[in-house]
């Protein structure tokens, strides 16, 4: 299995958030993680990427047990996270941000070549490569966040609400970017409140409820959509 989570418990102090989460994620898929506000979606992604420590349970990525490893070692293995909100370094230029994405590697020429490739793949970044990144628009910043994550050479990308705060037009662009990355072989776990966007690009849907995965289905399975709507609309 590509990513395998078994009976995962995560607390904040005495507050129990994840209470026995188990899920299997296949390589090459876009997996959509749904759940009400506060259900623990961000907590789960942060636990996979090593930013949170679980109380018990295990997380396996290919042949490696991730829990217990430092977050930078998890990143080196190829599991990268895009956090909620846009995490770029606002006072640095586009290129400087991309260089940071390659921080764990040393070969300067190879890094420069990859930055060139990234600027071709996302022409808007190429055009604004020398701009301070705080001057980029919301959608451009989101593109930079994705490019930055790709610089880490991720195999699995964990994305927490990439469409947050974007206009409908830019939301479509983010969706296209995500499907494009997936076609190139990147596996993606997506947390997305925009149900229409999430369901339109996901292969598999997981619903987090009461600290567990309460539902898991193919996104083509309509009962998954109904279940998700029930959670979101409370109906
Ligand atoms: N660092 C923290 N310390 C204490 N409690 C936390 C911390 N982070 C999150 N929580 C709590 O844990 C619960 C789960 O939070 P989490 O951010 O994982 O939810 P979420 O599903 O991502 O919600 P949203 O959809 O609003 O982003 C919430 O009740 C939240 O208040
Ligand atoms: Mg969240």
Functional labels for PLM-detected ranges:
Residues 13, 69, 94-113, 121-123, ...:
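ABC-type ATPase nucleotide-binding domains, specifically the catalytic core motifs of the NBD
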Residues 34-36:
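The feature captures the beta-strand-to-loop junction immediately N-terminal to the Walker
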Residues 49:
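Helix-to-loop junction immediately C-terminal to a conserved catalytic motif
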Residues 57-65, 77, 111-115, 217:
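Conserved ABC transporter NBD signature motif
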Residues 132-136:
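Conserved ABC ATPase signature
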Residues 149-150:
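ABC ATPase C-loop
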Residues 157-161:
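Catalytic Walker B motif of ABC-type/P-loop ATPase nucleotide-binding domains
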């Amino acid at each position: 299995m590509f990513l395998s989570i078994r009976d995962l418990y995560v607390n904040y102090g005495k507050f129990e958030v994840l209470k026995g989460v188990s899920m299997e994620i296949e390589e090459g898929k876009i997996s959509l993680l749904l759940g009400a506000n506060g259900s623990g979606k961000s907590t789960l992604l942060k636990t996979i990427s090593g930013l949170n420590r679980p109380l018990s349970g295990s997380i396996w990525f290919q042949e490696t047990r991730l829990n217990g490893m430092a977050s930078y070692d998890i990143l080196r293995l190829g599991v990268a996270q895009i956090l909620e909100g846009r995490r770029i370094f606002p006072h640095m230029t586009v290129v400087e941000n991309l260089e940071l994405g390659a921080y764990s590697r040393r070969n300067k020429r190879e890094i420069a070549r990859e930055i060139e490739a990234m600027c071709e793949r996302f022409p808007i970044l190429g055009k604004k490569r020398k701009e301070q990144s705080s001057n980029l628009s919301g959608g451009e910043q989101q593109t930079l966040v994705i490019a930055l994550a790709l610089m880490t050479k991720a195999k699995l990308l964990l994305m927490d609400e990439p469409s947050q705060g974007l206009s409908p037009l830019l939301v479509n662009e983010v969706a296209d970017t995500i499907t494009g990355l997936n076609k190139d072989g990147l596996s993606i776990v997506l947390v997305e409140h925009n149900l229409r966007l999430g369901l339109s690009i996901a292969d598999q849907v997981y619903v987090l409820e009461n600290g567990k995965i309460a539902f898991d289905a193919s996104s083509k399975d309509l009962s998954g959509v109904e279940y998700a709507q029930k959670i979101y609309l409370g109906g």
